[in-house]
Structure formats: C-alpha cells, structure tokens
C-alpha cells in the first residue's frame, strides 16, 4: 500500500499536470497563427470557441472547441494510469487551467468545452447525457448558453443516479463554476437579450 505522503504528492502532481495542460490558450494561439490578431480584443474578450467564432472563421472555432475539449480528455486519461483519484485531480486541474491560465493573466474561457472533455475522459457515457441535454435544449430554445447550463446541470445528477458519488461531486463543483462563469449570460437570458443560435449581429 502506498504511503499517504506519496499518495498526496501524486494527487498534487496530477492536479498541476492537468492545470498546465488545461491552461494552453488554444483559442488565442490559433487566431494569432491565422493572422486574425488577439481574440481577446473582440466580442466578449473570451478565448473560447464561441468568441473565436466571432472572427467569422468557423473552422478555427471548431478547432478551438475540439482542442479545448481534448485538454480535459488527455489530462484525465493520462493521469488514469495512476488511478481514478489521479484522473479526477488532473481533470479538475485541466478545467481550472482553462478558466484561469497563468500565461495570460488568469483570464481564460468559460469552461464548457473542457468540462465536456474531462467528462469524456472520466465517464464517456456522461458525455452522451451532456450532448443529449444540450441538443434538446438548443432545439427548444435556440440558446447556446442555456443549453450548456442545462447540460452541465444534468450531468452530476445522472452520475449520482448511476451510483458514482465521487464523479458526481466533481462535476457538481464544476457545474457551479460553469454557472458562475456564465453569470453575464444568465442575466441576459433573464432580460431576454441573450443572442440565439444563428442570430446575426
């Protein structure tokens, strides 16, 4: 049996590994490489895929979405070689790294893509629940932000109902953070001023 000190050091190491991987600002890197300047200077100032889409480059936005998700998936899967607790720590680290990347003043994205990526790495069936909830909400409301909020709310409930308390607790915490990061969107949803999917301007 591993010593408690070693176990704790392993978890801290996994958390740091996840954070470093998650803090790679792909949205910023890709837009600069494409000659589109600093994505933080347009739209919401966010480095995530939604704001990258405001550059008008759909392929770049899709690439940002995929890479931001893969950060979470890779962190969880690599750390899983050292056990589920290490995978959970690394996944959470990647999520936090995306939200608060040290390289750009701790101002990152809103975390939805990385949330999904971590979910794929830790409980792929939960990712299907997320996708289904997102699609249904999007079809009914046409609000991308609301779809993400509903999907992230459903995930910990689904995980808990399947008897996975550890993952349910992790994603409950991550869901709370996603809601906090979307507080401006929530205000606009309540005011009826949030942009709908496909809306111009």
Curated annotation (Swiss-Prot):
Keywords: Cell inner membrane, Cell membrane, Lipid biosynthesis, Lipid metabolism, Membrane, Phospholipid biosynthesis, Phospholipid metabolism, Transferase, Transmembrane, Transmembrane helix. The chain crosses the membrane at residues 10-30, 60-80, 86-106, 116-136, 166-186. One of its GO terms (cellular component) is plasma membrane. The keyword Cell inner membrane applies. The keyword Transport does not apply. It catalyses: an acyl phosphate + sn-glycerol 3-phosphate = a 1-acyl-sn-glycero-3-phosphate + phosphate. It comes from the Bacteria. Pathway: Lipid metabolism; phospholipid metabolism. SMART domains: G3P_acyltransf. GO terms for molecular function: acyl-phosphate glycerol-3-phosphate acyltransferase activity. GO terms for biological process: phospholipid biosynthetic process. Its EC number is 2.3.1.275. HAMAP family: PlsY. Belongs to the PlsY family. Catalyzes the transfer of an acyl group from acyl-phosphate (acyl-PO(4)) to glycerol-3-phosphate (G3P) to form lysophosphatidic acid (LPA). This enzyme utilizes acyl-phosphate as fatty acyl donor, but not acyl-CoA or acyl-ACP. Probably interacts with PlsX. This is Glycerol-3-phosphate acyltransferase.
């Amino acid at each position: 049996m591993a010593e408690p000190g070693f176990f704790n050091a392993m978890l801290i190491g996994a958390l740091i590994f996840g954070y470093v991987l998650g803090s790679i600002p792909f949205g910023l890197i890709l837009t600069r490489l494409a000659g589109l300047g600093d994505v933080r200077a347009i739209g919401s100032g966010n480095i995530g895929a939604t704001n990258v889409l405001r550059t008008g480059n759909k392929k770049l936005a899709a690439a940002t979405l995929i890479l931001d998700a893969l950060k979470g998936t890779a962190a969880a899967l690599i750390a899983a070689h050292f056990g589920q607790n290490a995978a959970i720590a690394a996944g959470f680290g990647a999520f936090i790294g995306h939200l608060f990347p040290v390289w750009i003043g701790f101002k990152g994205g809103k975390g939805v893509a990385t949330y999904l990526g971590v979910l794929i790495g830790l409980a792929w069936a939960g990712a299907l629940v997320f996708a289904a909830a997102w699609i249904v909400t999007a079809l009914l409301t046409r609000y991308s932000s609301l779809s993400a909020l509903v999907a992230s709310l459903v995930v910990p409930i689904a995980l808990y109902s399947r008897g996975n308390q550890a993952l349910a607790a992790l994603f409950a915490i991550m869901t709370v953070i996603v809601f906090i990061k979307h507080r401006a969107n929530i205000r606009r949803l309540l005011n009826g001023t949030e942009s709908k999917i496909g809306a111009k301007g």
